Design a protein with these regions (language model features):
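Conserved Nudix-box catalytic region and its N-terminal flanking loop in Nudix hydrolases
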Residues: 1-4, 11-63
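A generic structural motif
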Residues: 7-9, 125
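Nudix hydrolase/Nudix homology domain
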Residues: 32, 75-175
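A short coil-to-beta-strand element that immediately follows conserved catalytic motifs
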Residues: 65-77
Length: 175
């Protein structure tokens, strides 16, 4: 799953993954991303992915337990992709994309995240532009989200339910 957390000023929380991460260390990514576990109903489709997202937002972003509930997350869509992290690891998943607009205090887990920041659309575009020329690396799934869904999400932050679809968008293998 991928969570896009926007504050009340419509800025998106992004994170730079910790250097110690096994897959995609040090890359910039969306607010929170991970995978459901085979526990407590997390394997059960959209609702299971929402439960996993809430668990990871508490664990990874340090959001106070119970502050965000699974029904606060707006399901947007799903995308299927493959992305090689290195010679050993590859992501191959159906990524459930969720969005939420809320002001929350965060206390990032340094084992998971080295930096966070809130960005507006222009600032995010500048970061992506730097990724093409500088030493800035962007998560491949985050690039897919930005290129295919994020503008529509940003335009509809006040009516997120109006843009959800039940498709699985086939993205293929990405670099």
């Amino acid at each position: 799953f991928s969570v896009l957390l926007f504050d009340l000023d419509n800025r998106l929380l992004i994170q730079q993954r910790a250097d110690e991460k096994i897959t995609f260390p040090s890359i910039w990514a969306n607010s929170c991303c991970s995978h459901p576990l085979y526990q407590n109903g997390e394997e059960e489709g959209i609702e299971g992915a929402k439960k996993a997202a809430v668990r990871k937002m508490t664990q990874e972003l340090g959001i106070q337990d119970g502050l965000i509930q699974s029904n606060d997350l707006n399901f947007i869509t799903k995308m299927h992709y493959r992305a090689r992290a290195d010679k050993k690891w590859i992501e191959h998943e159906v990524d459930y994309i969720f969005a939420i607009k809320v002001d929350v205090d965060i206390n990032p887990n340094t084992n998971e995240i080295q930096k966070t920041r809130y960005v507006n659309q222009k600032e995010l575009n500048n970061l992506f532009d730097k990724a093409n020329s500088d030493d800035v690396r962007i998560g491949p799934w985050f690039r897919l989200i930005k290129d295919n869904f994020l503008n529509k999400i940003w335009r509809n932050l006040e009516s997120l339910q109006s843009i959800k679809d039940n498709k699985i968008h086939q993205m293929g293998e990405i670099k």
